[in-house]
From Swiss-Prot:
EC number: 6.1.1.17
Organism (species): Methanocorpusculum labreanum (strain ATCC 43576 / DSM 4855 / Z)
Function: Catalyzes the attachment of glutamate to tRNA(Glu) in a two-step reaction: glutamate is first activated by ATP to form Glu-AMP and then transferred to the acceptor end of tRNA(Glu).
Keyword Cytoplasm attributed: yes
SUPFAM superfamilies registered for this protein in UniProt: Nucleotidylyl transferase, Ribosomal protein L25-like
GO biological process, alphabetically ordered: amide biosynthetic process; glutamyl-tRNA aminoacylation
Full protein name: Glutamate--tRNA ligase
Family as reported in the entry's similarity comment: Belongs to the class-I aminoacyl-tRNA synthetase family. Glutamate--tRNA ligase type 2 subfamily.
Length: 560
């Protein structure tokens, strides 16, 4: 095997390792890979080991994007294998008793738009309906008017459509009050519930002491009279509650004689303003899950206590329970997820709206350039395990990159730019591909006439810089430099940073909005024509062009 071939193999193996792990590998790891791939070279291990540090320096000098581009040109099969491995991971375990089809539901409260936590519930249920066939209900759980934002009805529907959720039926619980009253009456007749007129605080104290409420022992006839009086408006808010009889000594106090229906007059319902008797979640959910024929319910383990409550209702009516699966909690660092917290921040001007990039809503992710396919893939990768986990932004970004990379044309963005005059350089122009290794997509031509825009942070370092796709310069002052030849090999030997640059005459002002703040700078003028599309700013990352105002680009940073 020739020395040049050995060096090329080492370079490719180093690139594969760096792309896979998003970091420059250790020399020992590369030596082991070389020996594993070419056992006949073990006698040359010493010479090969001496080559590795120099090659790793070359790999380290490349950006993440450049490493992938190099690897794609040298060994496209390696990238394909990485993607195949990801695809194989996008599977979930089989559900029991699902072979003949399933009936499942996504049932949010319309208090605001959907966020990443909602995405998990909707995607997991949608996955199984698409796998087995059947019905998928979008059930709007809007029986608590205090938690209903009228604008959320439309926002949630839009979010589900964006996410590609295959809803087959839509049900509004606020259209079903008569059904809940009917089953509340039946439950009273069965002796499975009672109408409690005790003070709520007194009831809570008794419950914690495992002492039954006196109302628990009243007759069915008296319960039905109180129920009719409640529906007739003879009780004020807080004066009466329908409670389900459970075990007053149950180990979980939340399960003991839980509330199922109440009077609420202080907040009118936006869809049903005449209603004042409202079922609580556990009652309406149990009734609807049965009547709509749910076969499987997949939700977070914070609902385990609710499942225990609902089981009492199922048992009183003699209904068959669905199969319940409770997945672990998922913490999401770095973004606001609380609907009340988001609304407060919007009202106070802290956030620009529900799609502010500091929020974890799906519409905020979409505005940044995150694709629904990536959210789905990342969610399925997380799976349904009952162990609590932390959401992986790295995985979401990797999934998103796999979706957007092929369509993202490459351009320069110069942050915090300074104008630099370069002495001694020939008047020339740079030719850069719109997309690596695809000449049919065209090229960008950047003319050089003596003055360029460069990142201030790079100018402050001094020394030699390599202007990408152009030539080398030596920095001579805050706004000056001199031509230092065209040799890329010389730039590498001097460990010169490869930097993006722009001609001063044609650069377009550009604001790049990131979660950390706004980066002011300049982009290539062609970016003005990419409104609503995603580009990759070389050595910066993917960005979605959000607006173009009077020749200025407003872009949202997606990820690297």
């Amino acid at each position: 095997m020739a020395d040049a071939d050995i060096r090329n193999d080492i370079y490719v193996l180093a690139l594969e390792n760096a792309v896979k792990h998003k970091a420059v590998p250790r020399a020992g790891a590369i030596l082991g890979s070389v020996m594993g791939a070419h056992p006949e070279l073990r006698s040359k291990a010493k010479e090969i080991n001496a080559l590795i540090p120099e090659i790793l320096e070359e790999v380290a000098a490349l950006s993440i994007e450049e490493r992938e581009e190099k690897l794609m040109s040298l060994n496209p099969g390696a990238i394909e294998k990485m993607h195949e491995k990801k695809e194989r991971s996008h599977e979930l375990p089989d559900l029991p008793n699902a072979e003949s089809g399933v009936v499942m539901r996504f049932a949010p409260n319309p208090s605001g738009p959907l966020h990443l936590g909602h995405a998990r519930a909707s995607v997991l249920n949608d996955y199984y309906v698409k796998k087995y066939g059947g019905k998928f209900y979008y059930r709007v759980e809007d029986t608590d008017p205090k938690r209903v934002d009228p604008s959320a009805y439309e926002m949630v529907s839009e979010d589900l459509a964006w996410l590609g959720i295959g809803i087959t039926d839509v049900v509004y619980q606020s259209d079903r009050f008569a059904i809940y009253y009917e089953y509340a009456r039946k439950l009273l007749e069965l002796g499975g519930a009672y109408m409690c007129t005790c003070d709520n605080n007194e009831f809570r104290e008794k419950k914690l002491k495992k002492i039954a409420c006196p109302c628990r022992e009243i007759s069915v006839e008296e319960n039905l009279k109180r129920f009719d009086d409640m529906l007739a408006g003879k009780y004020a808010e807080g004066e009466i509650t329908l409670r389900v009889k459970t075990d007053i000594a149950h180990p979980d106090p939340a399960v003991r004689d839980f509330a199922a229906m109440r009077v609420l007059t202080s907040t009118p319902h936006p869809r049903k303003p005449a209603i004042f008797v409202y079922p609580l979640m556990n009652f309406s959910v149990a009734v609807d899950d049965h009547l709509l024929g749910m076969t499987h319910v997949i939700r977070g383990k914070d609902h385990i206590a609710n499942t225990r409550r609902q089981e009492y209702i199922y048992n009183y009516f003699g209904w068959k329970m669905p199969y319940f699966y409770h997945y672990g909690r998922m913490s999401i660092a770095g973004l606001e997820l609380s609907t009340s917290g988001m609304r407060k921040g919007i009202n106070e001007g802290l956030y620009t709206g529900w799609d502010d990039i500091h929020l974890g809503t799906l519409r905020a992710l979409a505005r940044r350039g995150i694709q629904p396919e990536a959210v789905r893939a990342a969610t399925i990768d997380i799976g349904m395990g009952d162990t609590d986990i932390s959401f992986s932004w790295e995985n979401l970004f990797a999934q998103n990159k796999a979706v957007i990379d092929a369509g993202a044309d490459r351009y320069f963005f110069v942050p915090d730019a300074v104008e630099v005059e370069i002495a001694g350089a020939p008047k020339t122009e740079a030719h850069a591909p719109v997309y690596p290794n695809q000449p049919e997509r065209g090229e960008r031509v950047l003319p050089f006439t003596g003055r360029v825009l460069l990142p201030k942070s790079e100018m402050e370092k001094g020394g030699m810089l390599r202007l990408k796709d152009l030539f080398n310069i030596n920095i001579t002052g805050p706004n000056s430099a001199e031509y230092a030849g065209d040799s890329l090999a010389e730039a590498r030997s001097q460990k010169a940073a490869i930097v993006q640059w722009l001609p001063t005459e044609t650069a377009a002002p550009c604001s790049l909005l990131t979660p950390e703040g706004i980066q002011e700078g300049f982009s290539e003028p062609a970016v003005l024509g990419y409104l609503g599309r995603i580009v990759q700013f070389e050595r910066v990352g993917f960005s979605k062009i959000d607006a173009v105002n009077d020749g200025k680009v407003i872009a949202y940073f997606t990820h690297r």
